[in-house]
C-alpha cells in the first residue's frame, strides 16, 4: 500500500514542481515587462505590500544571497497573487499575460477559474509536501487541477 501512495505522491509532486517553475518564469517575466513599460523599478515592487509578501521577498533575498531570489519564494507567495482584490491591480494589467493557454485571459471569469485552481493547487502542494496520507484527495482531480494550470501557462500549439 505504501508504494501505491508513494507513486501517486511522486506524480503529483512532479506536477507541483513544474507548476511552480512556470509560475516563477511567467509571472516574473510579465511583471518585469510591465515594470519596464511603465517605468517602475523592479518587478517585485508591483506586488502588494503586505507583511506576508514583504517577509517572503526579504527571506528569499537573504537565502539567495542576491542571485535569482525568485527561486527562493515559496509556492504560497505565488498563490497569494491570485486573490480577488488583485484583479484590477495585477491580473488585468499584467498577470493574465502569464496564461497564454487561456482564451480571453483578462476576463473576470478566467481570473476566477485561475484563483480557484491556484487555491486548490496550494492545498494539494501542502498535503503532499507534508506527506498527509489521511487527507489524500481524489488523485485524478488533483492531477487535472495541476495540469489545467500548467497547460494554461503554456503557449497554445497550432
Can you name each region flagged by the protein language model?
Residues 1-158:
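Amphipathic alpha-helical interface elements
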